[in-house]
Amino acid sequence: MPVNIKAKLVKKEALKKDVFKFSVEAKEIVDISKPGHFIEIRVSDQVEPFLRRPISIFNMDKENGILEFIFQVKGKGTDLLSKKQVGDEVDLIGPLGNGKFDYSKYQNLAIIGGGIGVFPLYELAKEAREERKKCYHLFGIQK
């Protein structure tokens, strides 16, 4: 069942000029999330932009309750999000989506992704390793 929380931004990294990695304290979400889940983020306390932004979960530190997500600035909403500073609160709803994957059916896994879409595959690869599955990674990038 998704929860709505105010999470504290504890680390902000600019991976490129328009790509950011945020680390937030979100134990309530981390405790119930699985690979494949995502969160929805309210980017502003103002009326506009009205809609939350769906962002995939990159990494979950279950021991410390830290959730990490990576996003690319593509419009007004993600631009506002990129301006948040360490110490700010971020309004999150999550986990959302289908985080169910039955590893017992497979001996080998191929994880395929491209561009900004490779980041949510990290949690899937971590879980596959924990399940002792042989995992092949194919990633496409723009030059």
Predicted feature residues:
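FNR/FR-type flavoprotein reductase catalytic core
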Residues: 76-143
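Ferredoxin-reductase
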Residues: 2-86, 142
